[in-house]
Amino acid sequence: MINIRKTHPLMKIVNNAFIDLPAPSNISSWWNFGSLLGICLILQILTGLFLAMHYTPDTTTAFSSVTHICRDVNYGWIIRYMHANGASMFFICLFMHVGRGLYYGSYTFLETWNIGVILLFATMATAFMGYVLPWGQMSFWGATVITNLLSAIPYIGTNLVEWIWGGFSVDKATLTRFFAFHFIFPFIIAALAMVHLLFLHETGSNNPTGIPSDTDKIPFHPYYTIKDILGAILLILILMLLVLFTPDLLGDPDNYTPANPLNTPPHIKPEWYFLFAYAILRSIPNKLGGVLALVLSILVLVIMPLLHTSKQRSMMFRPISQCMFWILVADLLTLTWIGGQPVEHPYIIIGQLASIMYFLIILVMMPVASIIENNLLKW
């Protein structure tokens, strides 16, 4: 009798995706982050669901309801901090996952890559809206500053911003709709992740060499299930260390002050995972220019397949491109640091140089490095 997991309509899908899936024999720990992102998403949905049971999306009670969750709800504090720090872990995994894709040329799977970019945008939107919900000072002013950027769009900008706000400023209507969107978006992300996986399984996984691995496949279970479990244990360990020892390490102290439209905090800045984009936004003195640079800093990922000039897929055997990649990583870390600094000398010029470098490395230096490597190998 044939195994039920191979015949049952539902179990067959799970089997083909997680059990009998043919996987390359040589994929490294950089391939763990896909499953870790899945774990992060499930964790965020579950903790978020329990938070939503006690949260009130109203300007007068939102801040108090979060305090109530932390003080009065059984284990509310751990749920709240797992959700807040879970977002940080989510973005760490996201950046690693995207970085892996760039390094090993995974962007040549066009559909998978493009859905991945959409997933990145959706996750960033969700995190932004979630940051507004506690209705602290940084929640309110972050929402005001970021939504206001849309007013830079010619002709329709002002109307668009007021439409999003549901009034003439960030107020009750804004908070309510942000809560509604923040609740629904993770489920949209989950659906998109399924499509992401569907397209990936059409081609099979890439591997560190970038060479087709059809001749050497192994079953996903037990080899990569056990490897993913190790990654998951490490993820949860780091998350719980954050939650239980330094829950506010990555947060902003200003968000423990209730939102006050009459008092602007001295330094308005987003959560750490948006600082690189925020630095790029601030480095351009023009409002529309800044917004365009902000969007393009992420949207540039879409054109990565067009910028691939190398005859090899992966960077594994391309030392010049490897140098470019790690300079890009250093540049992103510099931008992240600058995004959290006040707008004054020398931070302004460092931010502008780092922003120019970011686009220069991706659009010019990496493609040129690839051409040089092709010529060195006489290809």
UniProtKB/Swiss-Prot annotation:
Keywords: Electron transport, Heme, Iron, Membrane, Metal-binding, Mitochondrion, Mitochondrion inner membrane, Respiratory chain, Transmembrane, Transmembrane helix, Transport, Ubiquinone. It is found in: Mitochondrion inner membrane. InterPro entries: Cyt_b/b6_C, Cyt_b/b6_C_sf, Cyt_b/b6_N, Cytb/b6-like_sf, Cytochrome_b, Cytochrome_b_C_euk/bac, Cytochrome_b_N_euk/bac, Di-haem_cyt_TM. A ubiquinone binds at residue 201. One of its GO terms (molecular function) is metal ion binding. Heme b b562 binds at residues 83, 182. It holds the Pfam family Cytochrom_B_C. It is a multi-pass membrane protein. Its cofactor is heme b. Heme b b566 binds at residues 97, 196. One of its GO terms (biological process) is mitochondrial electron transport, ubiquinol to cytochrome c. Component of the ubiquinol-cytochrome c reductase complex (complex III or cytochrome b-c1 complex) that is part of the mitochondrial respiratory chain. The b-c1 complex mediates electron transfer from ubiquinol to cytochrome c. Contributes to the generation of a proton gradient across the mitochondrial membrane that is then used for ATP synthesis. Belongs to the cytochrome b family. Heme 1 (or BL or b562) is low-potential and absorbs at about 562 nm, and heme 2 (or BH or b566) is high-potential and absorbs at about 566 nm. The cytochrome bc1 complex contains 11 subunits: 3 respiratory subunits (MT-CYB, CYC1 and UQCRFS1), 2 core proteins (UQCRC1 and UQCRC2) and 6 low-molecular weight proteins (UQCRH/QCR6, UQCRB/QCR7, UQCRQ/QCR8, UQCR10/QCR9, UQCR11/QCR10 and a cleavage product of UQCRFS1). This cytochrome bc1 complex then forms a dimer. This is Cytochrome b. The gene is MT-CYB.
